[in-house]
A protein has these predicted regions:
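Extended repeat-based solenoid scaffolds, especially LRR ectodomains
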Residues: 13-15, 21-71, 76
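Beta-propeller blade signature
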Residues: 24-42, 88-99, 144-154, 163
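Conserved blade-ending motifs and adjacent loop-strand segments that build the rim/top face
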Residues: 49-61, 102-122, 155-173
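C-terminal structured "cap/appendage" subdomains that terminate the fold
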Residues: 119-164
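Generic long, charged, amphipathic alpha-helical segments
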Residues: 84-135
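Sequence/structural signature of beta-propeller domains
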Residues: 10-14, 20-28, 83-86, 140-143
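Short beta-strand elements that form the blades of beta-propeller/WD-repeat-like
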Residues: 9-14, 70-82, 129-137, 181-183
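Short, small-residue-biased leader/transition segments that mark boundaries at the very start
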Residues: 1-4
């Protein structure tokens, strides 16, 4: 098919050098954004680190999965060398995968974020026309909230902040689905 006409497949992955340190309870390695390129004509595969900032749980606008995507989103990680637990950071990253630039969205003092989830504007074909949603845990008051961020103005204040009546545990993952997808 059409994919073979492209000759080079490019993948962006959140990769760490090893999954664990000394054992499965050692989280001293944190992941970073890498670019893998697979040349279909020559069979060669290359790897390049895109950024030194630790991040994980990468996402794109789900309407662009498996297609060329300009924008990718990662949750920041902190605690490099922490052998006891991976530390979710207080930021999200928006990468322009075409030019390598990265914008940051600060989630607040004393907070830890979660996996970013993309919600596109219904009916829009523009990749960056939508919202990035993130569960945020406040370590100070042990409460959680859902932040909704304009993908096209990523570093700006959230367009909405929804306080939740309980603390969402770390490691929660999710997806955005429309009413039509539920039917």
């Amino acid at each position: 098919g059409d994919v073979y006409k492209r000759q080079v497949i490019t993948l962006f992955v959140s990769k760490q050098d090893s999954a664990f340190g000394a054992d499965s309870g050692d989280f001293s390695e944190v992941s970073r954004l890498h670019r893998w390129q697979i040349n279909l004509a020559t069979g060669q595969v290359s790897e390049e680190k895109v950024d030194d900032r630790p991040g994980d749980f990468g996402r794109v606008n789900d309407n662009f999965v498996g297609q060329p995507s300009q924008f990718g989103y990662l949750m920041a990680l902190e605690g490099e060398g922490n052998s006891e637990e991976p530390v979710y950071g207080p930021k999200l990253y928006q990468y322009d995968l075409y030019n390598g630039q990265c914008k940051e969205h600060f989630l607040g003092d004393g907070t830890r974020g979660a996996e970013p989830v993309y919600a596109p504007v219904p009916g829009s074909d523009a990749e960056n026309d939508g919202w990035v949603m993130c569960l945020v845990h406040n370590e100070t008051n042990n409460k959680s909230k859902l932040l909704i961020i304009d993908a096209d103005d990523f570093s700006a204040a959230p367009v909405a902040s929804i306080e939740l009546p309980y603390a969402v545990p770390y490691g929660a993952h999710g997806n955005w689905i429309t009413d039509q997808q539920l039917r």
